[in-house]
Amino acid sequence: PSGHFCLTYVQKRKIPEKFFDNLYFTTNYEKFIKKLIPDCDKELVPDARLVIPFYDHYNELIAVTGRSLESGSKVLRYVTVRTNDSKDKLLFGMDTVDLNQPVRIVEGQLDSLFLNNCIASGDGNLSIAAKNVDCKEKILIYDNEKRNKEILKMMHNSIELGYKVVIWPDYIEAKDINEMVMSGISPDAIEEIISNNTFSGLEAQTRFTFWKRV
């Protein structure tokens, strides 16, 4: 309903309204998961969360992520639970992606909602996610965190593996797609930035070297 704090949260993050029907809310994530998956043995939190469902190519529910609506260093921001016993890499957005077109791969589920034909890894292991996507062209879009050693290591590895990687221009200060949108950059403008800053091979290595030093 209008004014609800979860609705206020997604509106504040400027999530496109067309996705509102695909997102859910629970006042108690632990109870929600126990009802959905009675034999779940994962440690859960009994707090209010935005619920983000994962579906496969066949529109079968394969997992859910609970995104905390609170902030703070002690808050576990994301809690993801599978609905099956699969060991495959979890990917968000596989129910809507067109594998005949270039596929963008980002870290965050909410970030993926702002880009065309985009899926999310749910973590920084984008090259592992890419291995699990059967399409001709994949573009890896890491968070804009040049001070994060883990991100740098994974970006370097992806470039070495030959993937196309986005090297964010220096004037971009936001750390991820959602923050860029919240700072006033339109999704269309972000699409253009991505298009103009996607590199592979030697050019990616060169630009990556300069980017991480700035």
Where does each model-flagged region fall?
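TOPRIM metal-binding catalytic domain and adjacent DNA-binding surface shared by DnaG-type primases
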Residues: 1-51, 55-58, 97-98, 159, ...
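Short, exposed beta-strand "edge-strand" segments with a Pro/Gly-rich flavor and a Y/T-containing core
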Residues: 9-14, 82-95, 168-175, 179-183
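Phosphate-handling DNA/RNA-contact segment within nucleic-acid enzymes
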Residues: 31-137, 150-152
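TOPRIM fold recognition
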Residues: 74, 100-103, 109-214
